[in-house]
Amino acid sequence: KGSMALAHNGNLTNAAELREALELNGAIFHTTSDTEVIAYTITNERLRVSSIEEAVSAAMDRIKGAYSLVIMSPQKLIAVRDPHGFRPLCIGRLGDGWVFASESCALDGIGAQFVRDVRPGEIVIADKGGLRSITTHCGQCPRSLCVFEYIYFARPDSVIDGSCVHTA
């Protein structure tokens, strides 16, 4: 039903379990990466539903752990943040287009304007019609940004969920 590219930041806690189930269904893995498990999970769900957005939402019911995703299909760019909000993800505007990044400083680097953070559990779709959100998974879990985000992973010039990393 089409092709997609996937970028992933994070770690799954149930990757081995998902991988085993997917292999029993005929999936052949080429890496040991969580990213490949996520891609197969979305692809597997896509066979059952009518849109990639529905497939991503269904996959979120199965994927557990810390993740932010950016998925590119021929017609859409889709950004996803895990329901806990463990990993940051933000939206930017560059000319007439939309960009997504794990840190706001990446937007600065390309001259994009920060728009907002992706909410925990939110699926954001950018296409010819503009920007829209699916919030089915929002508010399902307590908010839990990874403790290492501010002190180890993020650059000091980033802003995550409204807080400057340097002063947090």
Where are these regions (language model features)?
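Conserved short alpha-helical segments that host acidic/polar catalytic motifs at enzyme active sites
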Residues: 1-120, 125-168
